[in-house]
């Protein structure tokens, strides 16, 4: 963190802290590989405490107490597009589950209880410690994950002096409380990935438009994240749909674009940032009628675009 802060200062970039927020996650233990493979029909258990180190299928949920709130016949989904299991029995020390949709269960992955709301604290203990550190270091940009109340925003502003709070909209509860959250926040961030775990993926385009519209009503900046340049995590070129999505998002009134996995684990993080910056620049030219005239006069070919995209290789 200190290293990042020094680099950010040199580049005159404000460093931000993103909280974990109220979310259930997996804890894989007792195995060399940090994942479990389960198939449809498999019976497995979720331990309420991660103590059995020799368990060949050792998995628990964080926070631990959440297991006591789960009832029989509820469905658990592990990560987006991951395995799904139904709770058959809730015993004193574990949940007995049956897999209904096979897949991998990774470590520290998000967990959803389908069609069932569980009230979780706004911040983990790790979050609270991180906010104290942010305050001591003078970090002023705080992103609240899974923000679902003005209480969370007030807590951050009391804990971190002069904090600029960006509330992340990524749950149904966030949408229900959107007006209050927009009113009390300094900015809004739409996480399309986590939001998809709570609402139908077909509704994401319309949720995005509605959230941006509400943020603009309160004169708050609104940013959009997830699947921005997903293809560049592994590939060398973005898709035309991705480029069009970015420009379409800007046309909706978004204040900016946020890169996540593209720069965290992608193999061309710098290129991703350059592409977004270039598109924003071209969008501004287009708004004042300059870019389209340039395209008509001197058409940029796909080959020339590839040269530009790969110039740093």
Regions found by a protein language model. Name each.
Residues 1-313:
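Non-catalytic helical/linker scaffolds that mediate oligomerization, partner binding
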